[in-house]
Amino acid sequence: GVLYMNDFNRVVLEKEIKSHKLVFHELMQAEPHVFISRKHPLADRNKVTMNELQDYPYLSFEQGEHNSFYYSEEIFSVEEKKKNIRVRDRATLFNLLIGLNGFTVCSGVIDEELNGKDIIAVPLEGEGGMHIGYITHRNISLSRLGEIYVEALKRCVLT
């Protein structure tokens, strides 16, 4: 699977990775960004801060009742927000980003062909870095399909 590590979740994830005989392969380092609508009031900014975003709805993925916040898909999911909406799928998240001028925190990697031109990534100022990569089992080689997937991931982060 693909995941990110940062200062908040690194110790927990590295412990889990080691205990399950997995290996983390870093694909890239990224500074946090926000996905917002191209029509969002802050869309013309070169950078934004969490303080500037506080009055807009924060959208995040529902993690289920038994999942630890260390495994969250978003890097600020444990912080309280004025307006927080949890969704279960990417299409709903993007529709609410556009319809409600919401935002979500991400790596900044976006594919216009896949996501359309209505969503943009804007750098989030002063929030620390992310190490993005994938995991494999230490003692099991990737299948041919797995190798193709990893090569596609590498192409995505290089473009």
Q: Model-flagged regions — what are they?
A:
Residues N6, R10, M50, Q54-E79, ...:
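Secondary-structure junction motif
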Residues T49, S141-R155:
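Short amphipathic alpha-helical coupling segments at ligand-binding clamshell hinges
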Residues G1-M5, N9-V11, G102-S107:
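Paired acidic/hydrophobic, glycine-rich loop segments that form the ligand-binding mouth/hinge
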